[in-house]
Amino acid sequence: HFDNLAPKREAWIKKSKGFYSEDIKYMQELIPNGSSILEIGCGNGNLIGSLNPISGVGIDISAEMIIEAKKQYENINFTVADIEDTNCIKNLDQTFDFIIISDTIGYLNDIENTFDNLHKVCNADTRIIVAYYSPFWEPILNIAARFKFKMPELPKALLNETDISSLLDSAGYETVKYQKKIIFPFTLFGVGRFLNRFLSCVPILSYMCIRSYVVSRSLKSASLDTPKSASVIIPCRNEKGNIRNALERLP
């Protein structure tokens, strides 16, 4: 399926320019230039290539998608691999500042196990960003795909940001931020940018957004890198003359 779509992937992105440009803008807010980035399910490299990584690795199960990615972004290391294969992560000999899982999570057979394997490429400061469609929009997106307004996709799991956060929590991650974005997936001469910037932040209207972003960190990596500390508590009351002696006797 994805191999067949690879030659037309860039055309689909241009056709849905409003959506993809907003997605990239928000990712750029989350990820500073010059970061080390791993993208899982990178497709033709459009997203990771737009983030200017100092060190970038893109993984995709589709060989044809990787061929297209290598044509466009020579400075990024693209690899054909199945992220659910444990050897895929073992072959990565570095940790990353950011790990992006954009629209890929719904195709995984064992989401929690995949998250668990990713601890190996996390350090205390690594942030995992999971971006996914809102289930609310699924019927609309299916209709759009049927009438060729959107790239066709295989059936996938429907997950909201609470589901994703729970799966991350079960795998040993802590959610540090989540946000809904993109309420209007069209440019419309700049109107789309205005609506997405201001209306998607309104609490009630945010539930109508197409996109959710869940940002988390590895608790396993954080606990390994955090220096151990101890507290010594001395309960005192009306013992002004003894406090100095108590402190001096501490080892």
Predicted feature locations:
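A conserved beta-strand element that flanks and buttresses the S-adenosyl-L-methionine
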Residues: 100
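A short glycine-rich, Lys/Arg-flanked "PGG" loop and its adjoining helix->strand segment in the class I
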Residues: 112-124
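Class I SAM-dependent methyltransferase SAM/SAH-binding core
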Residues: 43-85
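Acceptor-substrate binding/catalytic loop of class I
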Residues: 146-163
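Conserved class I S-adenosyl-L-methionine
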Residues: 1-32, 46, 129-151, 189, 242
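Short, well-formed alpha-helical segments that are part of the catalytic scaffolds
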Residues: 239-251
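Cell-envelope/extracellular polymer assembly enzymes that use nucleotide-activated donors
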Residues: 228-231
